[in-house]
């Protein structure tokens, strides 16, 4: 449309889902004017079902927290309403920043909502900082071990660690973290729980062969 009709981008197709009255099925709204409030779209679905944790604009991995009066923009594709956050009661928490998921600011925001005390911050060694401040994975899909980072979390006295890794990379966290007594949280947990989706922890199928990857088989709740 931008090329053929010389039409500016002022309409968006937006999906609203998760902790809503009437169930967690996806509600897709077509040709929504940019500037429409988040709250207006949520009300069109029937409203939020009781208590909730946060409203996220964007996807579970790279989205950000928003408010009911915030406007949708030309880059908005989804609005997600999460389950309430579990209360860590001030427990010491470590943050592992990966290029796959949220940046440090987003992870610290989630840690605050979990009521955890951030004690240690580590970065995946392949999440290299770029000139604009973002991070880019040097070798996507070929994940390094996270034993060193897990040891640093343990030495810092962390009870929990909050990760943002993809399902492949979370394997490397789960291979050693729980054995050290570290309790693993993923930055998407509050959103996955809202739709009954298994939590991202361990990839259970091989990446080496072609297969029909059923999400239910790829992750585990622990």
Which residues fall in each region the model found?
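N-terminal basic/disordered segments at the start of proteins
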Residues: 89, 93-111
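Short, solvent-exposed amphipathic alpha-helical segments in soluble enzyme
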Residues: 2-7, 31, 45-49, 70-73, ...
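Cofactor-cradling patches in redox/metallo enzymes
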Residues: 109, 119-211
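Ubiquitin system architectures
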Residues: 47-51, 56-93
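Hydrophobic alpha-helical positions that pack around
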Residues: 1-36, 44-51
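Short acidic/glycine-rich loop or secondary-structure boundary segments that cap or lie
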Residues: 22-24, 63-67, 95, 103-106
């Amino acid at each position: 449309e931008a090329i053929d009709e010389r039409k500016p981008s002022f309409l968006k197709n937006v999906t609203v889902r998760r902790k809503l009255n009437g169930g967690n099925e996806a509600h897709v709204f077509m040709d929504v004017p940019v500037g429409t409030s988040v709250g207006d779209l949520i009300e069109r679905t029937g409203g939020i079902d009781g208590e909730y944790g946060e409203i996220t604009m964007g996807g579970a991995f790279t989205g950000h927290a928003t408010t009911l009066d915030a406007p949708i923009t030309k880059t908005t594709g989804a609005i997600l309403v999460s389950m309430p956050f579990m209360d860590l009661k001030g427990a010491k928490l470590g943050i592992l920043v990966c290029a796959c998921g949220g940046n440090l600011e987003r992870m610290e925001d989630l840690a605050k909502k979990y009521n955890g005390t951030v004690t240690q911050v580590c970065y995946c060694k392949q999440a290299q900082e770029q000139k604009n401040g973002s991070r880019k994975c040097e070798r996507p899909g070929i994940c390094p071990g996270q034993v060193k980072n897990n040891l640093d979390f343990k030495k810092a006295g962390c009870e929990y660690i909050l990760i943002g890794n993809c399902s492949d990379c979370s394997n490397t966290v789960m291979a050693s973290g729980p054995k050290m007594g570290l309790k693993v949280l993923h930055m998407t947990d509050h959103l996955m729980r809202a739709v009954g989706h298994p939590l991202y922890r361990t990839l259970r199928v091989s990446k080496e062969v072609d297969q029909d990857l059923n999400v239910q088989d790829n992750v585990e709740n622990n």
